[in-house]
Structure formats: structure tokens, C-alpha cells
Amino acid sequence: MNMLALTIILPLIGFVLLAFSRGRWSENVSAIVGVGSVGLAALVTAFIGVDFFANGEQAYSQPLWTWMSVGDFNIGFNLVLDGLSLTMLSVVTGVGFLIHMYASWYMRGEEGYSRFFAYTNLFIASMVVLVLADNLLLMYLGWEGVGLCSYLLIGFYYTDPKNGAAAMKAFVVTRVGDVFLAFALFILYNELGTLNFREMVELAPAHFADGNNMLMWATLMLLGGAVGKSAQLPLQTWLADAMAGPTPVSALIHAATMVTAGVYLIPRTHGLFLMTPEVLHLVGIVGAVTLLLAGFAALVQTDIKRVLAYSTMSQIGYMFLALGVQAWDAAIFHLMTHAFFKALLFLASGSVILACHHEQNIFKMGGLRKSIPLVYLCFLVGGAALSALPLVTAGFFSKDEILAGAMANGHINLMVAGLVGAFMTSLYTFRMIFIVFHGKEQIHAHAVKGVTHSLPLIVLLILSTFVGALIVPPLQGVLPQTTELAHGSMLTLEITSGVVAVVGILLAAWLWLGKRTLVTSIANSAPGRLLGTWWYNAWGFDWLYDKVFVKPFLGIAWLLKRDPLNSMMNIPAVLSRFAGKGLLLSENGYLRWYVASMSIGAVVVLALLMVLR
């Protein structure tokens, strides 16, 4: 039990050593430190898991020190382990370790090799703090650490201005969500006097029994933080641009760390959301809308990583849908299985990119199944899991649990949205696979090999099959029991979702293996061009935000840069100067000018006196 802190300390040690090496170490030494620290953290997690199950899945807390103590405000740096945090910890360190191992191969020869692993080690440490925190403020520390590391890693190739812009965009958009989370923190402490998760859930029913609507505002702010970090509507615009970073970073962000943080936040504070059913229903609606919009956007992408990015957005949408219909176990189960097959797909896409000499446009590839058969197999299995192919994939079991939860709790509309999303998922996933690995070879791909390349792919491939679905998160007693669907209804739903997935795959095969001319004619038609452009640009959210927020902000910044307050303070001086110049012109030395001026002045004075009288 006392080993819990090591899951944070070990990656932190790796970060410190790599940071102070300042790139002087060889790639082998940097890889040993960077990969080894996360590997040791994963090993410690395994020991912790064995101990946890040996003690009857008894939750416990490990106080480390008092972080802050100001008057009645006391915040401890305390870690908590229960079934929920153990599941997340296993995903973060386990899948994170496999991604680090792959990255040691992928990043060979890249400038900043040790810097890369320094950032990823800090990323893992921050995520572990977020997962194990027993209070909202400590979670917020890890939350911000994850945001910082994502900025550093997305902009890893900082010499390219586009990468810097993508990193800044991710940083700014997620900061919007972080502000909402900070507001939630302030509201909850002001109302309950504590930020400890267990204490908040215990105190909330009595405190908010009189209909105080501050709890609704607090949960809305929590939802705002979650949608920012997990790239859900309306703060989803950063995720596709985050593909500017190295491919292992994409795998780390999408599978093991950042985007799962928002999903984790809601179950961790589930007691508060259960008291605000309207907000909880909104969580499900946000997820349903996001998964549909992301599915259509993925269908027209040409960049292999952007297809996977939108698929992540869609799958996180399924998790939000599950949370919204109170299918708590299903949401975490899908989070775990998604980590397996999404890490597999991203790492396999990295292999494709390197084999194709850093080409990412899927239409410039083709016929790669012969050149890189292992990667092709990984895409088939990972794509099948993403598409929830029946019985043989982990994704089928976890996604069906979500749809069953929606149906059992009476949210038929959300279940239908989930089925439509499942069809879209299988369609765009196998569109990508058929274009990249079948058809005419357009680029000479070289073979990719190496133990550190193949081993992580093989492990993730196995976990993406039904084997991964055998790992059941120990959530009993941590989250409320999910309403179960009757056996007959469950069987009908499984058959329906399976048929939907298979039909999507068959349609993709018909269109992109046999009828590409039909696809081209549809894409070149007027409606096709209109919808294609709209979906390709993610439904125009970037354009809208640019017009509504970015341009006005830049205009205000341009104005403030010129110090308008100081300019206003100069107005009296400018007026006095002009008045002085005018009076100076009247001093011309001509007597007739002075007589005329006096006469005019006298007439004006007399006129004023008469008017005023």
C-alpha cells in the first residue's frame, strides 16, 4: 500500500534526470531512463493491483503531507486507491509504458530525443496525480500538469510555426475548460467547506436539500472542465490540430492520458451529478451530438492521423453518453478497451507514416498490406475493435454495454444516436483501411521492424480482441449499479449493433474497393462538395469561433496595445495646444483686426445678454 506514491515518483525521477541531462546522453541511455521509469511505475501498479484484490478490493488512502493550511482551509497531498482509480492507473501506466517503448523506436534520430522522454515522463506523472488525488484541488494540479505537457508535446517540432500554433490552440481551448473547473472548485468549497471527494458526496445531500441551485452551477462547471479536456462539444476544436505532435504523443493523449481525464472527472464526482439529473442528462446529449458530428467529419478526412483523431472524439462521446444515462461501469469499461485499440491504431499509423517516408495523406498510399503485413494486421484488429465487430473484439462488448445502459434507462433517442454512430465508425474506419492497404501501390514503402516496434503492437493487438474484454474493472461499490437490460432485449440489441457494424464495413468495401468512381462522382457533385467541405472543416466550428471570439479579441488587443487610456488623458493637452495656436494667430499686429474682433465680441455679448434676459 505504501508503494502508491512510487507511481508518481518514478516518472518524476525520469523527468528530472532527462531534463538535467540537457540532451548530453546517448539515445540508448535516454530511452532506458525514459521508458524504464514508466515501466517501473507499471510494475508497481501491478503489485498494487495484486495487493488490492488480495485485500478484498478494500479502498484506502495514503496521506503524504499537508499541502496547504490557511485558517480553516486544509488541503493534504493525499492519494486514494479504489476500483476506479486502480483502473485508470493501470491504463495510464500500462498503456503508457507500451507507448513509451514504441516511442524509443519511433523517435530514433530525431532532434530532442531526451527532451521528448522528459516531457512524456512528466505527462505520465501529472496524469497519475490527477487519477490518485483524493481532493479536487490536488486533481486540479495534475489537470494543469497534463495541459502543460500536452502543449509541450504537441509543439515538440517547434521550428515549424504550424506546430506552435496547434500547441497554442490546444493550450488556450483547454484553458477555457480549466477556468470552468476552477469555478466549480470555488463554488463547492464555498458551499461545502471541503474539496475532498468523499466528504463532498457525504455533505452535499443535506446542504443542498433546500433546493439551493448552486449545486447545479457547480456540476455545470465540472461538465465545462470535462468537455474541454476530453474534446467534446463545444470545446472540441483543438483535438484534430493536436496531430501536429509526434505520433506516439497522439497515442498518449488519445489513449492513455489527456482526453480520458474529463471522462474520469464525472464518475469521480458522480454523487454531485446524481443530485442534478438535468445536468447529467446534458452530459449524455453532449456525448451523443459529439459522436455524430465527429463521425461525419472523420468520413472525409485525408490525413490518417486526423481520421483517428475524430474517431477518438467520437468514442469519448460514447463515454459521455454512457455517463449521461448512468451506465457508469460501461463508460469506464469502454475507456479501458478504447485505450487498447486506439493506442494500437495510432502506433500502427506511426509505422505507416515512417514506412511511407512521413507521408500522411491516405490517398497517396495504397497496397501496403504486402509491404508491412504486421501493421496491416494491427489495423484490421484495431479497426474491427473500433467498429465493434461482434464477439471477437473488445470494442463490441464495451460499446454494447453503453447502448444497453441507454436502452435500460429509457433513453431510446440516445441509443439510436449510438447505433448511427456505430455505423459511421465502421464506415470511416474501413474506408481508411481499404484506401491505405488495398488497391494500387502508389508509394514504395520500406519494411518496419525491431523488438521495441513490434512488441507493443502485438500486446495491444491481443488486448484489442475479446481478451481485452475479459479484464473487468473492479467498480463494484465505487459507482452506482447500472440498470441491467432483460436478456431477450440485450440479445436483440447485440444482434442489431453487430449487423450495423458489419453493414458499415460491407458498404465501405463496396465503395472503396469496388465503386470508387461512384464515390468520386458523389464527392464532385454540388451537394457532395458542399457537405464534404463542411464536414472536412469539422462543421465550421473553427470558422465560427474565429469570427465570434478570435477576431474581436485581436481587435481589442490591437486597441489596448496603443494604450487608449493614456491617449484619452492626452486629449486636454492636445485641445489646449490647438487653442493656443488659434489664439496665436489672432496676434497679427493689425489694428483693424483688433477693432473688428472687439466689435464682434461686443455684439456677441449683447446678443447673449438679450437672449438670457
Predicted regions and their residues:
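N-terminal signal-anchor/start-transfer transmembrane helix
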Residues: 7-23, 97-98, 227, 291
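Aromatic-capped, Gly/Pro-kinked transmembrane alpha-helices
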Residues: 72, 477-492, 517-613
